[in-house]
A protein has these predicted regions:
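DNA-contacting surface of Y-family translesion DNA polymerases
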Residues: 5-7, 14, 188, 198-341, ...
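Extracellular/lumenal ectodomain signal focusing on beta-strand-rich modules
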Residues: 113, 341-343
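Gly/Gly-Pro- and Ser/Thr-rich, intrinsically disordered tail segments characteristic of DNA damage-repair
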Residues: 1-222, 226-228, 352-354, 359-362
Length: 362
């Protein structure tokens, strides 16, 4: 069995749950099985946005981020449900606990995906046998499908898990990158967003192989440090270890300030709030992180303190976005009394390259 496990190197899994929100709803309500199901921000409004949908819905052409009215036009029988984030988080924790029965080296990177280092798991079987076992247990115990990428590093494992959906298993070795990875368009590369892709295409860098062959200085000029990183990844390299503690260190990133004098003037509070948003954005940038929960803390003149949070349907990191949602929370929950302290925290933060961006529902 050790022939599957290198003496020098790693065997990494990327476990990616398929259509997670929709799959949870179907698992909880078996009557939905086989039906086109979509999760949308506000099913009662035509302008709602599809957050995710089942593969039955995708067969009609329904896609994530599509407007609800357009989705219903394509699929009149579409079953549309509101997102139940507390339930999704609960199921997510159950999934990660199941993965930890195989190895303690499990690194959750979002609510529905995780890396696993199974290098020391040769006693449990071959990597393929372990992947099949994980898929079977998730289906038998939770009725949830997943795709698994198997590779020598995190980047290749992530790319592999995207290649066969739903419920697929893909092995992506370094020697496979020329035939399996390089022909893919740059938009499919883990870590390349829409803005980066547009810059690259202007320089006739159209697929992952082009990134691998591109001049390093050009990539650095176009994309900064991330350009160098992308070239290394396109060549099949990724030194990052699977770190179970990584999720803990990124749980919350925030900034707060106690005013020398209590503030009751709204315009003055907005200036302070803007400064805090800038501080948080700077800290997120330093950690190359994003988050999908904004929390505002207000401490009044009499030391009474409230904290209010807003769960978003997309990850944010910019000062403008942080300020926008923080101001919304302030307007909703400030009682008009003098404020002594304000604080903004981004919770559920993740590494920017480890999340899948979704269009905001708002």
């Amino acid at each position: 069995m050790n022939k599957w496990y290198p003496k020098n190197g790693y065997v990494i899994f990327h476990v990616d749950m398929n259509s997670f929100y929709a799959s949870v709803e179907i698992a909880d309500n078996p009557e939905l099985k086989g039906k086109p199901v979509a999760i949308a921000g506000n099913p009662d409004e035509r302008k709602g946005i599809i957050v995710t949908c089942s593969y039955e819905a995708r067969a009609y052409g329904v896609k994530t981020t599509m407007s609800l009215w357009e989705a219903r036009k394509l699929c009149p029988s579409l079953v549309v449900l509101r997102p139940n984030f507390p339930r999704y988080r609960e199921v997510s924790q159950e999934i990660f606990k199941l993965l930890e029965t195989y190895t303690p080296y499990v690194e959750p990177v979002s609510i529905d995906e995780a890396f696993m280092d199974i290098t020391t798991c040769s006693h449990l079987g071959s990597p393929i046998e372990l992947a099949v076992s994980i898929q079977n247990k998730l289906l038998e115990q939770m009725n949830l499908p997943c795709s698994i990428g198997i590779a020598p590093n995190k980047f290749l494992a992530k790319m592999g898990s995207d290649m066969k959906k739903p419920n697929g298993i893909t092995i992506l070795r370094k020697r496979d990158i020329y035939s399996k990875l390089w022909p893919l368009p740059i938009e499919e590369m883990y870590g390349v967003g829409k803005k980066s892709a547009a810059k690259l295409r202007k320089h006739v860098i159209n697929n992952i192989g082009d990134i691998a062959k591109a001049d390093s200085q050009l990539l650095k000029t176009l994309l900064g440090v991330n350009g160098e990183k992308l070239k290394s990844r396109a060549l099949g390299n990724d030194p990052r270890p699977v770190d179970p503690e990584q999720a803990e260190s990124f749980k919350s990133i925030g900034s707060s300030t106690t005013f020398p004098k209590d503030i009751v003037d709204y315009e003055e509070l907005i200036i302070k709030l803007n400064d805090l948003a800038q501080n948080v954005a700077t800290r997120l940038e330093r950690k190359d992180a994003v988050g999908d929960t904004v929390q505002l803390m207000i401490r009044y003149y009499d030391r009474k303190t409230i904290t209010r949070r807003m769960k978003l349907s997309t990850y944010i990191y910019s000062k403008d976005d942080i300020f926008y949602y923080s101001e919304m929370l302030l307007n909703q929950h400030w009682n008009g009394a003098a404020i002594r302290l304000l604080g903004i925290t981004i919770q559920d933060a993740k590494k920017k390259e480890d999340v899948t961006y979704q269009l905001s529902l708002f």
